[in-house]
């Protein structure tokens, strides 16, 4: 009876036969196949005497489940890389140069000793404001990581030494030297988007030597105005990363007005001040300019813009727009036209009435004038002498030299 039971238990043999019907030809063959293909069930069948057929079936089902259990750990291992992918943002995966730039950021911050740019604390690649800052420096250097690293390092060192935020917030500048020369406005679109505009009124220079004589003071005043504008860009509040090859909402518009300015002479003081300004702005404020408009520029000065195209990149010069009549400026911004001052074709008050500027203070020498008025005789003589001497000081110079500033200043913050 014990020898006949395996012959009656046909379920296991049938399973094997289904997989290889051409091989199974006899009962003996089924026995050999069962013994060869399923050695484990035979061992367990020997230990179980009450229901061998049932045990064999159970053993087979248990054996079938074992491979699935063995395959589970590899599946878990394959899921680990998927979980690690979010660690590298998409904008880094698409831009290897930007990823390399971020790898260098800790060393850059360490070597410069400063970790703030335009009000943005420099953190890591998961911080949108930080990413936007690095994108600007990388763009300015056409994707060259080494050059971008060098420029960012210099800019950070400069900010540490100069403290431009303090220049804009807590420093006062001479109204006599800089009053009426620079303004800041913010114009809102219907959708709430803001347009930051800086104005440089070169025709407002009263005395060349007074305004440009102290080069360091002039540069600080110019930086203070720029910092006010940068603050209005609100880069530290960014919640998304700008498209490296797309539009950049963190840029400003600049207007240079040359009304009543002559371009015929080059004063050494102006040349030195503007050259220094160009160096500072090119290094410390890359990719912050959207467009630059030169208004009230004489038609004969077209050579100035032709010269710029020789020395500046196409990416920079394409942002320059000369306009001979300043009253046509507002036409360039149809949706903002009413917010522009009347003198520029809009409906708003003059810049002197509605625009912001840097902190200005009267010179210490100004209050001394009333004390001299007590001695009318002496004062009259002095005033007469002064009035006679003024025509001899060539009043045409103030108009001539600021124009050269206009000629050179456009490149100051061109990028």
Swiss-Prot record:
Residues 372-393 have a biased composition (Basic and acidic residues). Residues 1-87, 358-415 are annotated as: Disordered. It catalyses: a 1,2-diacyl-sn-glycero-3-phospho-(1D-myo-inositol)(in) = a 1,2-diacyl-sn-glycero-3-phospho-(1D-myo-inositol)(out). GO terms for biological process: Golgi to plasma membrane protein transport; regulation of exocytosis. One of its GO terms (molecular function) is phosphatidylinositol transfer activity. Keywords: Cytoplasm, Endoplasmic reticulum, Heme, Iron, Lipid transport, Membrane, Metal-binding, Microsome, Transport. Heme binds at residues 202, 222, 256, 258, 292. GO terms for cellular component: cortical endoplasmic reticulum; cytosol; endoplasmic reticulum membrane; plasma membrane. Residues 177-352 form the CRAL-TRIO domain. Residues 47-63 have a biased composition (Polar residues). It is found in: Cytoplasm; Endoplasmic reticulum membrane; Microsome membrane. Residues 64-75 have a biased composition (Low complexity). It comes from the Eukaryota. It is a peripheral membrane protein. Its cofactor is heme b. Belongs to the SFH5 family. Non-classical phosphatidylinositol (PtdIns) transfer protein (PITP), which exhibits PtdIns-binding/transfer activity in the absence of detectable PtdCho-binding/transfer activity. Regulates PtdIns(4,5)P2 homeostasis at the plasma membrane. Heme-binding protein that may play a role in organic oxidant-induced stress responses. PANTHER family: PHOSPHATIDYLINOSITOL TRANSFER PROTEIN SFH5 (PTHR47669:SF1). This is Phosphatidylinositol transfer protein sfh5.
């Amino acid at each position: 009876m014990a020898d006949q039971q395996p012959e009656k238990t046909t379920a296991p043999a049938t399973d094997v036969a289904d997989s290889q019907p051409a091989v199974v030809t006899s009962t003996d063959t089924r026995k050999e196949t069962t013994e060869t293909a399923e050695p484990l069930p035979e061992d367990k069948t020997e230990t179980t005497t009450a229901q061998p057929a049932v045990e064999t079936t159970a053993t087979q089902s248990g054996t079938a489940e074992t491979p699935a259990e063995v395959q589970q750990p590899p599946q878990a291992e394959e899921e680990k890389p998927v979980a690690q992918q979010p660690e590298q943002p998409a904008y880094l995966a698409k831009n290897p140069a930007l990823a390399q730039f971020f790898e260098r950021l800790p060393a850059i911050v360490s070597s410069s000793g400063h970790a703030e740019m335009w009000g943005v604390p420099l953190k890591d690649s998961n911080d949108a404001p930080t990413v936007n800052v690095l994108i600007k420096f990388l763009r300015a250097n056409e994707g060259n990581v080494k050059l971008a690293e060098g420029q960012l390092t210099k800019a950070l060192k400069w900010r540490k030494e100069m403290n431009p935020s303090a220049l804009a917030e807590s420093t006062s500048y001479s109204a006599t030297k800089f009053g009426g020369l620079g303004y800041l406005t913010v114009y809102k679109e219907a959708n709430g988007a803001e347009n930051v505009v800086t104005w440089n009124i070169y025709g407002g220079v009263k005395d060349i030597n007074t305004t440009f004589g102290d080069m360091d003071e002039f540069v600080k005043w110019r930086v203070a105005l720029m910092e006010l504008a940068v603050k209005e860009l609100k880069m530290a509040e960014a919640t998304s990363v700008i498209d490296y090859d797309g539009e950049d909402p963190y840029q400003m518009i600049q207007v240079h007005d040359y009304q009543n300015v002559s371009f015929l002479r080059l004063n050494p003081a102006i040349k030195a001040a503007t050259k220094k300004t160009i160096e500072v702005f090119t290094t410390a404020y890359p990719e912050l300019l959207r467009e630059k408009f030169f208004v009230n520029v004489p038609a004969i000065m077209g050579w100035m813009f032709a010269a710029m195209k020789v020395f500046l990149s196409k990416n920079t010069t394409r942002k320059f727009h000369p306009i001979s009549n300043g009253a046509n400026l507002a036409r360039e911004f149809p949706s903002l036209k009413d917010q522009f001052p009347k003198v520029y074709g809009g409906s708003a008050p003059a810049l002197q009435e509605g625009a912001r500027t840097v902190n200005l203070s009267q010179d210490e020498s100004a209050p001394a004038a009333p004390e001299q008025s007590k001695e009318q005789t002496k004062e009259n003589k002095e005033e007469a002498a002064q009035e006679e001497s003024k025509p001899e000081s060539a009043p045409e110079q103030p108009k001539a030299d600021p124009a050269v500033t206009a000629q050179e200043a456009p490149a100051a913050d061109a990028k």
